[in-house]
Curated annotation (Swiss-Prot):
Keyword flag Metal-binding: yes
Catalytically driven reaction(s): GTP + H2O = 7,8-dihydroneopterin 3'-triphosphate + formate + H(+)
Name of the protein: GTP cyclohydrolase 1
Residues engaged in binding Zn(2+): C85, H88, C156
SUPFAM superfamilies registered for this protein in UniProt: Tetrahydrobiopterin biosynthesis enzymes-like
Record's keyword terms, sorted: GTP-binding, Hydrolase, Metal-binding, Nucleotide-binding, One-carbon metabolism, Zinc
InterPro entries tied to this protein: GTP-CH-I_C/QueF, GTP-CH-I_N, GTP_CycHdrlase_I, GTP_CycHdrlase_I_CS, GTP_CycHdrlase_I_dom
Assembly and oligomerization: Toroid-shaped homodecamer, composed of two pentamers of five dimers.
One of the record's GO cellular component terms: cytoplasm
Main enzyme class: hydrolase
GO molecular function: GTP binding; GTP cyclohydrolase I activity; zinc ion binding
Pathway assignment: Cofactor biosynthesis; 7,8-dihydroneopterin triphosphate biosynthesis; 7,8-dihydroneopterin triphosphate from GTP: step 1/1
Superkingdom in the source lineage: Bacteria
Amino acid sequence: MEKPVTDRPSEAEVEAAVRTLLRWTGDNPDREGLIDTPKRVAKAFREMFGGYDMCPAEELGRTFEEVAGYDDLVIVKDIHFHSHCEHHMVPIIGKAHVGYLPDGKVVGLSKIARVVDIFAHRLQTQEALTAQIAGVIQDVLNPRGVAVMIEAEHMCMAMRGIRKQGSTTLTSTFTGVFKDTPEEQVRFVTMVRGGGA
């Protein structure tokens, strides 16, 4: 999964667009409290959408083959993230649970969390985020299978429209043996939910 290629506007163009949005809300972008808002928003957006400048596959490039014979399920759970809905550009706040069955090589645990962060720092749908995480791990590590579950609250449902605060959306995707073997799916979900293997 490569870095997306875009024709990125200049910082001055971004700041001008924010001034326009401030005027559109009915406020005055020249008042004291808003004078620096366009610059602050541009800086915040660069941070919140920094995933476009990173390649998640590169994070998985360094693997370890000497793991004392371990070849069973590896799960990194409760990876908290913030993303933004591609439809309304409002926050998605949630946590990801990522598991894989190694096939001779493992990756540092922090790299799994880093992959989640890179994709989360792009405009997203939860469904796409779930599939992207699983896809890059499957493509780069080539494990026997990958399982990803995401639980998230969408501010586009909480702050606008239907206004249902606290509702959570669950998505999951499975590759390899997880896709082919329902018992492996159950084992993953049971371990994520706090049960034994």
